[in-house]
Structures are given as structure tokens and as C-alpha cells.
Design a protein with these regions (language model features):
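Short, small-residue-biased leader/transition segments that mark boundaries at the very start
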Residues: 1-3
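Active-site-proximal loop/helix segments of hydrolase catalytic cores
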Residues: 5-24, 113, 140-220, 224-232
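Flexible, acidic/histidine-containing loops and adjacent segments that form or flank the divalent-metal
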Residues: 19-171, 243-246, 250-274
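C-terminal regions of proteins
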Residues: 205, 210-218, 223-274
Length: 274
């Protein structure tokens, strides 16, 4: 593998990388991830935590989710001779048409301070089943997401947002678990984020997009990675996205593969463009 990107240090995103790095048949040349050490320098850290070790504390967020004896993800990558780089707005890969459109260093700094506090979020469990039955107007769809607060997780807000453009006029916007503030910041710093094929943030949660943001992004295709509960994906998110494009979800289609080749069995949208 030429490059791997860990968008943020939540267990459902970082966990699989430990297996990859411990697999002798897998070679990763480059690893992109962000940690508080990138933006919190020694003097600031010592004022906040005079009795702690800056490097180990800043990397705690990338500890193994369950194995306390494992190296953290950064040290494990370095021990495997991976080149580890921070990924902030403006970074462009030297050989692959992929660039970082968020977060900026300034946006990430206050989030890094919160991450160091080791804030633990309650796990968002929901075992109800997604359904799109019954009347659901455009007004209802918008209010069901716009009246909700922004995702307050600092790790989600600090997600790396990537833009992949393999050919002209074919763009993929990969939003990780970015929240509304992060996506707004990315849009303000980049002029070419509309009309992309987007990976919808945070499993289609109603706390990570608004109807206004969706209209600004105006995606030509929306893909959600979700288990198909009432919250993930949000019915309101799906409806607002479908004003612009077909909406796909892994809970309906399984693994989704985008290809430029002709296909005989295309994936079935969760909701077709309205």
C-alpha cells in the first residue's frame, strides 16, 4: 500500500490499522494522521501539564482500543518503517491525486487541547432498524437535522477531510466523521468541493450535516457507511441528500465499489434522487 490515512483516533476508525501494521504481508509506505503534538508545542504543553510527558500524552489517543500491551498506532507505524506525516489543509500527495482540505492547523489546535483531556463520549448505540415508510416532507426532513446540535466530539471535529480527483471532473470528497463546523471550515478554505461523490460523515448522523451544508456541497453521489439503524443513517440526512443525487448505504448494498468500467449489477440506492 502506498498510503493509508487514519482520519481520527476513534476506535472504529483506528482499530483496523493495528491488524494491517502487524500483518507481514502488508507494506504501508506512508501513514497520514494528526495528533495534538502537531499543534501543541513544548512550552504550551508544559503550562497545561507540567508533570506529564508531552509525546506519550499526545499519542495516547492512538492507543490500541483493547490491547494495553500494544504500541500506540504511531509508534507501531514508525517501528514498521512507515513514513508518518500530519495531514492538514493544503497537503498534497506527491504521486497520487489526493489532497487534504481539512482540518487547518488553526482549526485543529483547540480540538487538540480537548483531545488531551481524554474526553470520553457515550457510545451511540441504537438497535432500531432504519425505515423510510410514511409521508416525510422536505420541511420535515430539514427540521429533523437543522434543529439538532452539532456533533461535539473533538476527535470527530478533527477528522482529516480528503479530496481525491483521479481524473478531471471526477472528485471524491471523503469526510470521515467531520462535524458541521469542520465541514464549514473546509468549504471556506476550498473553492472546489461542490459536485463531488461524497462519503457522508459519521455514518449519516443528523449531527454532522445541515440542509444548508448539503446544498453547498451539492453532491453528485452520496455513500454512507452505516449499520442501518434509526440514527445511522438519519432519515432526514438521506432525504436532503436525495435532492441532489442517489444515496447509497452499506447496510443495503454491502461493500460499495466505484468503477469507471461497465457493470451488469449496479448497487441499489437506499434512496434515488428525487
Amino acid at each position: 500500500m502506498c498510503i493509508r490515512d487514519s482520519t481520527h483516533p476513534d476506535s472504529d476508525h483506528k482499530g483496523g490499522f493495528f491488524g494491517l501494521l502487524n500483518d507481514r504481508d502488508v507494506i504501508i509506505n506512508e501513514f497520514w494522521l494528526n495528533t495534538p503534538e502537531d499543534v501543541i508545542k513544548e512550552d504550551e504543553y508544559n503550562r497545561l501539564y507540567p508533570k506529564r510527558n508531552r509525546l506519550s500524552h499526545c499519542r495516547e489517543c492512538y492507543d490500541h482500543p483493547t490491547d494495553t500491551d500494544s504500541l500506540n498506532l504511531i509508534d507501531l507505524a514508525v517501528s514498521n518503517k512507515c513514513n508518518v506525516y500530519g495531514a492538514y489543509c493544503g497537503k498534497i500527495h506527491s504521486h497520487i491525486p489526493i489532497s487534504v482540505v481539512g482540518p487547518s492547523l488553526d482549526f485543529y489546535h483547540p480540538l487538540a487541547i480537548e483531545i488531551l483531556k481524554n474526553n470520553k463520549r457515550r457510545k451511540d448505540e441504537d438497535n432500531t432498524i432504519y425505515n423510510d415508510i410514511g409521508y416525510f416532507s422536505s420541511v420535515q426532513a430539514k427540521s429533523s437535522i437543522d434543529d439538532e446540535p452539532d456533533d461535539c466530539s473533538p476527535t470527530n471535529a478533527g477528522s482529516i477531510i480528503l479530496l481525491f480527483e483521479p481524473i478531471t471532473s471526477c472528485k471524491f470528497l471523503l469526510l470521515g466523521d467531520a462535524n458541521r463546523a469542520a465541514i464549514t471550515d473546509a468549504i471556506s478554505n476550498n473553492t472546489n468541493l461542490s459536485g463531488c461523490r461524497i462519503k457522508v460523515p459519521h455514518h449519516g448522523s443528523k449531527h454532522n450535516l445541515t440542509s444548508v451544508l448539503i446544498d453547498k456541497l451539492a453532491p453528485c453521489c452520496a455513500i454512507i457507511s452505516a449499520k442501518g439503524s434509526r440514527k445511522h443513517p438519519s432519515r432526514g440526512i438521506v432525504h436532503c441528500l436525495s435532492n441532489h443525487c442517489n444515496v447509497y448505504s452499506t447496510h443495503k448494498s454491502g461493500t460499495l465499489i466505484h468503477t469507471s468500467y461497465p457493470i451488469t449489477t449496479p448497487a441499489i440506492p437506499l434512496k434515488e434522487k428525487q
